[in-house]
Amino acid sequence: MTEVVRDRRRIGVVGADLPRQIVLAAGASPERLFGAWSGAVSPRASELLGAVDAVAGRILDSILAGEHDDLAGLVICNDSQANLRMFYVLRVLAARGEVPIPVQLLDAPRGQGAAKQAFVVAQYTRLVDFCRRVTDADIGVDELRRAGDVEQSVSDALERMRERRAQGRCAGTSALNAYRAAASVAPEAAVEVIDAASTPVGQGDRLFVTGSGHPDSSVYQELERAGATVVAEDHDAGDGGWFAGCSTGESEADVLVGLASLHASRPPSAARGSTAERAGTLRRRVADTGSTAVITLARDLDDAPAWELPAMRNALAELRVPFAARVQISADGALSASRDAVTALQEKDGSRR
Amino acid sequence: MTEDRLAAAAAATRHQKAWFADTVRRAQEGEPIALVNADAPHEVLRAMGIPYVVNQWWASIISAKRLGPTSLEHLAERGLPDFSQQYDAIPLGAQDLPAHQRAWGGLPDPAFAIAERSGDVTQKIFELWGEREGTETFLLSRTGADPVPSSWWEKVPRDWEDAFGADRLDLLQAEIEELIAWLSERTGRSLDRDRLARIMDLGNEQAEWNRRTRDLIAAARPTPVLVNDTMPAVMVPQWHRGTQWAVDTARALHDEVARRIDDGVAVCADEKRRLMWVGRGLWSDLDMYRRFHEEFGAVFVWSMYLAIAADGYPRYGEDAVRALAARFVGFTDQLYVPPWSAEWYVKEALAHGVDGVVHLVADDTPGAGFISEALEAEGIPVLEIRANNADSRSSGSARIPERIEEFLRERVPARD
């Protein structure tokens, strides 16, 4: 068996709660493991995780297959039930030596309040220690500030991309790929990819996508092939991702408190946010982005979006924006579900006219 | 009901009906009542004199009246999923059913719905309760199980700071204080902290009786009680935790079990194989637990309900609110999060001298295979069965009795 050489400059992440600045301060680059919309999940991954979103199973399979063994470490966010289960499983397997990557839980509950903030700051402090340990880097306030600037450059590039998208100069598929680069390659390279994201858009519906996260752009391609343009989304592989730098503060603790404050004010996610907040955010963003239709696509066993449907339907009815939803999407049913949903919207559009 | 039924089990069931009728009456007279998740800090409500109904218990009553499917259909009619976390969702669907379809006459609308944010969906269900006229929702955080030091059952009664970590406790303690303030604002009642401390003491006393009962059963040969009898005898008083009645009932169960042992009572006359049931109770076929007595001399001596009541609840400490946070901050971690789950089941299997384990694998928990693996590593054969414990269609198609028979024949030799 060949010994895998660990790359101290890359730390993997599952989920979307990572304050990337902390990893960057260690001289490493965060590399998000996304999984995929389609593909088999092995019986072993299914057995280990129990009944969860297949995307988590695909990520676990890639880890069990050794595809990420060269990472310096792996941070798993408690931002969904599926990801938390993955942490529990990998913690056991890592302790047994069956998975060679050091694994760390990042548990950052959303929302305001001093107690939550203190808990999140304590989690970030542990994350700093973990990054020091797996990279052998010194992390102090100077490194954190510099990393904050670097992260802000990614955030700024994404803001420029969102402006192009709003102006109809960047299609949803390109935007999603840019977000993917932002989350998984080194910042300088990511900025180049993001700034290059510029594609003509179609004349069909301006679509807002909510529901499950999109681990790859295959569904966006399908939606846009059908004539729509995805102009915005709230899932964490797109606009709901977290790219924010905090370069102020006199001490390490100040910077971590600053990051915790930024985290607390993030928009709500399906798995952790309240339905009322989510529906309110959707209504505001649909209006702001000039979206002409909304689509929810929720995978089987990723149930949180299904509980939001009546509230979202009501919120959109007030705006007179048509809405199509497909839930319990099977492991290989994403493309057909997205085609069905677009067709349903087009039929509604036809009947409106 | 069997001729072997424990008097404590029958008494508990009778008490529950009378208690529910009284709770309904109080609500009808205008008292605010609460609907709570099983892992919410009930003791606060008890200390503030607010009657509460546990969501999961209420779901079991609705299901037992075969109103689960109708309740779920009602959710679907509202555009909500009928396929997601059904057990927790059934009471929400049942709440608007017509009077003739309401179990035990129906649950009065609660003033408060209180839950922790476990999983992705519980908070959504409880949020929907809060949208109903006259009901408000309060949600508590549910942090991940990290750290997980070994032998949790030795640590959690007193060394809970180490067992769960101060950060997790700080957060939940602060949120319980917020809950107390929230309830005070709405009821005009303040929390008597001495009363809460007394309630914690009573809960600990109840757990101590359960521990003694569990230890008696672990050491007894032959086994003196049916597991399907200890389930209600333990679980009904659990929902009354912190009362003298619950302590007295736990003690009565202990004394009854002790008497049976002294009298040489055997639920299986010719006990040759001692079995452990890992997983939730098979509510759809409780008689299954005694089906292997005659042919195989095989008797189920263990289920988690008494054992977790013994090990999972005791929390001693000067600060009652922090001790209460310690009771709930990782309650389900004890049962379902590896490696804690596997370590505990092994400890219990060895203490009870079991010859084989039937593991009803839950698909809503991670790493169930680690439990089977750990038991097999101790030389204890395990039969894994995948089925829904509450759905008779699922358990029927899993051929549970037939597979247990095969397991007994092939892997669990009879004792001499």
How would you describe each model-predicted region?
Chain A
Residues 18-91:
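An N-terminal, globular interaction/scaffold subdomain
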Residues 14-36, 210-285:
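Redox- and metal-dependent alpha/beta enzyme cores, enriched for Fe-S-associated oxidoreductases
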Residues 60-63, 273-290, 307-308:
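A short, acidic, amphipathic alpha-helical segment used as a generic capping/interface helix at domain edges
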